[in-house]
Amino acid sequence: MFIPQSYTLAIILCFITMICWGSWGNTQKLTGKSWRFELFYWDYVFGILLFSILLGFTMGSSGNSGRGFIQDIKQAEGHNILHAMIGGVIFNASNILLVAAMAIAGMAVAFPVGVGIALALGVIINYVYTPHGNPTLLFGGVAMVVLAIIIDAAAYKKHSLSLKKVSGKGITLSISAGILMALFYRFVASSMVTSFEVPEPGKLTPYSAIFFFAVGVFISNLLFNWLIMKQPFEGNPLTFKDYAKGTFDIHLNGVLGGVIWNIGMSMSIIASGKAGFAISYGLGQGATLIAALWGVFIWKEFKGATKSVNTLIFLMFVAYLAGLALLVYAGA
């Protein structure tokens, strides 16, 4: 299987994660406001599973290091498979809440609040279980990210009040998503080998861990998304007849969103061997910065903002960049 051989390459993979995790939400935007997020999500989850299989039979089956994809699945112990799948279930619950928040409050709010909380809590959780890197720089980076979250929330509140359009539900969903999202990565990490080059028996290598994680997402979605269709956060209940009305392009957008997200997840897990779980997860969740850039500059979610709101948005970007820089240096 493919294994990165240097910290520099691992950091590059983490930045790919950041771009992917911060950009997949655009695929939901491209489906249009008439295509509800519950319908988008079926295709999105299929894209996640599809890419995990493709990755396993390509990068997971090439090279001479570690264990091959199929060989690794055959030798995996049940409790490790279960841990990776539980990670998928927790992620799916958190991501449904995040996508709902994004539909209600927009990318520029849902990502900084939801994913920002996930970054701060997730880095702490992963560092406690697997210490790696300079803790002063690591937690200094987390503190800067938390500051960016607070600034973004203040900007959103100020802008919403000026438009007389405050979505408490969007903020609540974002916070709930962030708390859950902080937990999923640890379950996947606990199922994995400590050495990619010389993997322990019974444990999962990155590629099989990603596959079983995706299976957990797929299976749980059959229940979670069905329930959300019956009892939506906003709007009328949906049926599978509504899903069947989607065009090929609309369904393709959803699948593409899942593929883009799982490219990010895969690069993060693969990078963790050299960067450590706390740093690979934390840098990946810098996706918030990318999503906020999309939301502010492409989708114009803060269009018509006052000068004070624009100043807050600028300060949010500065705080995020400072936090990400500290996370990179923490593992150097």
Identify the meaning behind each predicted range.
Residues 1-332:
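Polytopic alpha-helical membrane proteins, predominantly small-molecule transporters/carriers
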